[in-house]
């Protein structure tokens, strides 16, 4: 089976925060799981280096957009690597390959009659002497009356045109823009009304899209899909490949989602492999992003794929809700965020991955609390999982000189482990990652109870053979926990595998166990709870 996983492309205009990771982490869990199952996986993403936010930040800082994009693209790569993300291809939208691929998509849509020219009115800033596309305009959303950008309202997820906004201002200088005529290209989205309606009906029937994606897409379909502008007067981006219009750029909402396609093609060129199997109707496709990106993946991207004749319509949409911070809405402008480069300096990446999975905003907004983060590490990772691994391995090191005693696998434990692979695998495939991880940790708590009830420290004196059986079965559980937890906690799983000399990484029970163990070290260190107050003070102190 061919599995295509696309992670949303973060704007390269500022550091990643935990809200980004909360929405993107499911992609890596899926990729690791399907690879362990032996499936053919292509997991792609990249940095959005063409967006309006980058141009705005560059102008504000007096540097080039390329300098801003380079800085954050490199930082993103480091952060994703340090968090254990396993992209098969992580690229950027300002690459020559991406530009060429997107231009081919644009021309194909133009040739098929899905793109047309139209004279329209657009916001124009007389102070800055330029037309103002999407995010260059700010104001009030006409639907919910919250503050919004010219492309979208984060409060109600409405897709907007800058002229829709009330109380419009220029993002660059703050003046009120005028309205002038200009010519642009439009995407005939209305022609895909019935096809998109069918796509969402199937997703609803099969339960393969998150509820928020189904509800929002149904709303747009019910209102009637509206044609969308696909060109903009921007300083950076992919030039329109039509003579006389080279100064205009392809609008980021169509260009960025086409990044999945360009990354796939780039991967194929670099590896010499064929990517066609990821774009046919048999492919299982997963698109992983936050709820603010839903319409781009549930309406626009399917329509583009239909327009260019590709069959791999988004099968699964994994659209998480928002992550708040200490009960307040995350805000980059107010510096109310937990920044990824910062948290990685002090905390175990598996601790971050664990918390953002068990506390994931899968169906509702959830909160990142420093207190809950540190207590979850100490009680679950250290107190439950780390404790079971450490007490078992230390027992072997102390009483058996590192030689794993031999025995037979308990039938009840074997059935439990086999059931875990089935149940956890199903939960991952159904994108209920919190359920999957909690299921494993229920088994970890069962394992600690098993150790306590068997009392090997007493068995060693009273019944040495029974003690060997107990420890052998504990090693069996540890080996399988490392396997089951690898999609979620890759770093600690690798350490356990190394200690047990386990090579097999398949998604199946580990029945061949090691003869000896080496270099037993604690899997996790306790975090001083005094850090809670320190981190909260730091957060409030940095807020604007």
From Swiss-Prot:
GO annotation, cellular component aspect: cytosol
Motif annotated as 'KMSKS' region, chain positions: 329-333
One GO biological process term: methionyl-tRNA aminoacylation
Major place of residence: cytoplasm
Residues that bind Zn(2+): 141, 144, 153, 156
Keywords carried by this UniProt record: Aminoacyl-tRNA synthetase, ATP-binding, Cytoplasm, Ligase, Metal-binding, Nucleotide-binding, Protein biosynthesis, Zinc
Catalytic activities: tRNA(Met) + L-methionine + ATP = L-methionyl-tRNA(Met) + AMP + diphosphate
Cofactor binding annotation: Binds 1 zinc ion per subunit.
EC numbers for this chain: 6.1.1.10
Subcellular location: Cytoplasm
Top-tier EC class: ligase
Recorded superkingdom: Bacteria
GO molecular function: ATP binding; metal ion binding; methionine-tRNA ligase activity
Keyword Cell inner membrane recorded: no
Residues annotated as binding ATP: 332
Motif extent ('HIGH' region): 10-20
Cofactor entry: Zn(2+)
Entry function: Is required not only for elongation of protein synthesis but also for the initiation of all mRNA translation through initiator tRNA(fMet) aminoacylation.
Quaternary structure annotation from Swiss-Prot or TrEMBL: Monomer.
Protein family (similarity comment): Belongs to the class-I aminoacyl-tRNA synthetase family. MetG type 1 subfamily.
Listed PANTHER family: METHIONINE--TRNA LIGASE, METHIONINE--TRNA LIGASE, CYTOPLASMIC
UniProt protein name: Methionine--tRNA ligase
Gene expressing this chain: metG
